[in-house]
From Swiss-Prot:
Provenance organism: Chaetosphaeridium globosum (Charophycean green alga)
Gene: rps18
GO cellular component: chloroplast; mitochondrial small ribosomal subunit
Description of how the protein assembles with itself and partners: Part of the 30S ribosomal subunit.
Gene Ontology MF terms: small ribosomal subunit rRNA binding; structural constituent of ribosome
Phylogenetic lineage: Eukaryota, Viridiplantae, Streptophyta, Coleochaetophyceae, Coleochaetales
Protein's name according to its UniProt entry: Small ribosomal subunit protein bS18c
Localization per record: Plastid, Chloroplast
Main location: plastid
Gene3D superfamilies listed in its UniProt record: Ribosomal protein S18
Length: 79
């Protein structure tokens, strides 16, 4: 009985979507891109940021483009 209660609590908890309906994945949207980069400047994995495979591919391309255009740093070595 206790397992059923615990299982139902876990199943009912829903996580919010990391990207809202109005937001688009674009290299110029630096505020959005920063949410998907670690403190060291690495791109977070799909498991961590809960994106779909297609969204993760687009996010990675946008982050790399923004880095090349110097909108985002390649590394964050601020101590």
């Amino acid at each position: 009985m206790k397992d059923l209660v615990n299982r139902s609590k876990r199943m009912s908890r829903r996580r919010l979507a990391p990207i809202r309906a109005g937001e688009s994945i674009d290299y110029k949207n630096v505020g959005l891109l920063r949410r998907f980069i670690s403190e060291q400047g690495k791109i977070l994995s799909r498991r961590v940021n809960r994106l779909t495979a297609k969204q993760q591919r687009n996010m990675t391309k946008a982050i790399k483009r923004a880095r090349i255009l110097a909108l985002l740093p390649f590394l964050n070595n601020e101590n």
